[in-house]
Amino acid sequence: MQIIHTIRELRAWRKNAGKVAFVPTMGNLHEGHLALVREAKKRADSVVVSIFVNRLQFGQGEDFDKYPRTLQQDADKLAAEGIAVVFAPDEKELYPNVEQRYNVEPPNLQNELCGKFRPGHFRGVATVVSKLFHIVSPDIACFGKKDYQQLAVIKGFVEDLNFDVEIVPVDTGRAEDGLALSSRNQYLSAAERDEAPRLYRELKAVAESLVQGSLDYAGLEKRAVQSLTEYGWVVDYVEIRRADTLEVARAGDKKLVVLAAACLGTTRLIDNLEIKLP
């Protein structure tokens, strides 16, 4: 396995790499990331995993400085998976100008759901992913469904800007108690970790009501927020949306997703659950 740090070297490798699948990450890899890697391996001759903590997608007061940088441990995990290349550029390599002068601006979705609470986050995501697509030139890119809004943003700009890459969504990896796997789970105290699976349980309760025929979307959202709040969560949102577009769900929609973001202590957790109605 190669660890490549420069764009020039990565592009030189790419010329003879055949069909390439790509998994972009910020490192600190866990089983959820490795599930993406394994899916990527099924679909291509070679897999590239990028490791880059992208400053542009962190807002003021967020955890950019304390986000774990664990390149050697990550490389060991990826070597064990048989990955061809780890692309680990530094900030100057990916952003040679002091300021990124041109950005990818996702319309609509940028200011909804998580975008309301993390201004500029999805601009940062879309910009860095588009840069990485230009550098790696993958045939396929795998993204986890845990970051459902991020996945929708990436699908949107790939379609609208004619990127020649197939986006492969991969189901959310979960711990045995249902908690979605996330690098930020390590910030949780022992007591918070015990409480954290409640977020997924509330999503399942909403989904069950929808499957049983409830059309009181606002009521279901409100009850989930109230339940989480009673147990000490600070809730950003619980919302039911159309799964394909993330537009507000309407009666008669068959493919839905319920999404949530909430803070437990100082740790912000997100999760979602897709629902197909009969």
From Swiss-Prot:
Homodimer. It comes from the Bacteria. (R)-pantoate binds at Q57, Q150. PANTHER family: CYTIDYLATE KINASE/PANTOATE-BETA-ALANINE LIGASE (PTHR21299), PANTOATE--BETA-ALANINE LIGASE (PTHR21299:SF1). Its main location: cytoplasm. InterPro entries: Cyt_trans-like, Pantoate_ligase, Pantoate_ligase_C, Rossmann-like_a/b/a_fold. GO terms for molecular function: ATP binding; pantoate-beta-alanine ligase activity. This is Pantothenate synthetase. Beta-alanine binds at Q57. Gene3D superfamilies: HUPs, Pantoate-beta-alanine ligase, C-terminal domain. SUPFAM superfamilies: Nucleotidylyl transferase (SSF52374). The keyword ATP-binding applies. It comes from Neisseria meningitidis serogroup B (strain ATCC BAA-335 / MC58).
